[in-house]
Amino acid sequence: MADLDDIKDGKDFRTDQPQQNIPFTLKGCGALDWGMQSRLSRIFNPKTGNTVMLAFDHGYFQGPTTGLERIDINIAPLFEHADVLMCTRGILRSVVPPATNKPVVLRASGANSILAELSNEAVALSMDDAVRLNSCAVAAQVYIGSEYEHQSIKNIIQLVDAGMKVGMPTMAVTGVGKDMVRDQRYFSLATRIAAEMGAQIIKTYYVEKGFERIVAGCPVPIVIAGGKKLPEREALEMCWQAIDQGASGVDMGRNIFQSDHPVAMMKAVQAVVHHNETADRAYELYLSEKQ
């Protein structure tokens, strides 16, 4: 119990200065609860407003694909260079050391595989477990225009509703079926629907024509997917174009861990996302770091 002796009245109330309430500036997130804003502030660097996520959740439907055969050997050395880790709860518990001390976005949809229809997903994580694992967000695919569009949207709604109760953001990931065209019109539709359902972050693909319109039409932050493995210079150009056109970061997997020099590539991506380096400058950094 505090000592009650010698209690003195406060005097320095600065009555001439109004209380300062610093606004939360992340796009579309100013009205969220404190806990959710706190988690988002761990995902997005408060100084730059951007993020570099390392995605290695591919095994939930692809199995041990190239580069992800051994998470402990191939991916663990990259943890310190990422802002955020994106993975499944199985990998988090079995491979990621708790002392890593990086914010985690947990894969929350699944129940599909590359052997069947990819869009046929269900919610694969309870919000209780997401909280138990101290995650900063959960992520689920949304397949607009697919056979299972309705179910994938319901999955997002379910996660958003559960997340609002505990201050857990939901990231909607726009999946694309084999027969869908990857263009501005489609991604504008998909990202807007996901945001309208309440997702606080949207992960989508970069397109060369009209990406700035996708960003402008989406009321919450967009991070781009890395997609298939590209030559390092091309991947850095994609990053730069996306950030220049309004994206709030990248969530890259194969373009990092399938690179011949993944640590150097991670540092180059960080330079683009957080230090506004051009693709040329970032590629020079990559070349110097890989030696």
Curated annotation (Swiss-Prot):
One of its GO terms (molecular function) is acyltransferase activity, transferring groups other than amino-acyl groups. Signal peptide: none annotated. Involved in the degradation of phospho-AI-2, thereby terminating induction of the lsr operon and closing the AI-2 signaling cycle. Catalyzes the transfer of an acetyl moiety from 3-hydroxy-5-phosphonooxypentane-2,4-dione to CoA to form glycerone phosphate and acetyl-CoA. It comes from Escherichia coli O139:H28 (strain E24377A / ETEC). It catalyses: dihydroxyacetone phosphate + acetyl-CoA = 3-hydroxy-2,4-dioxopentyl phosphate + CoA. It is found in: Cytoplasm. It holds the Pfam family DeoC. Its main location: cytoplasm. GO terms for cellular component: cytoplasm. InterPro entries: Aldolase_TIM, DeoC/FbaB/LacD_aldolase, DeoC/FbaB_aldolase, FbaB-like, LsrF. CDD domains: DhnA. The active site is at K203. Keywords: Cytoplasm, Schiff base, Transferase. This is 3-hydroxy-5-phosphonooxypentane-2,4-dione thiolase. Belongs to the DeoC/FbaB aldolase family. It comes from the Bacteria. The keyword Transferase applies.
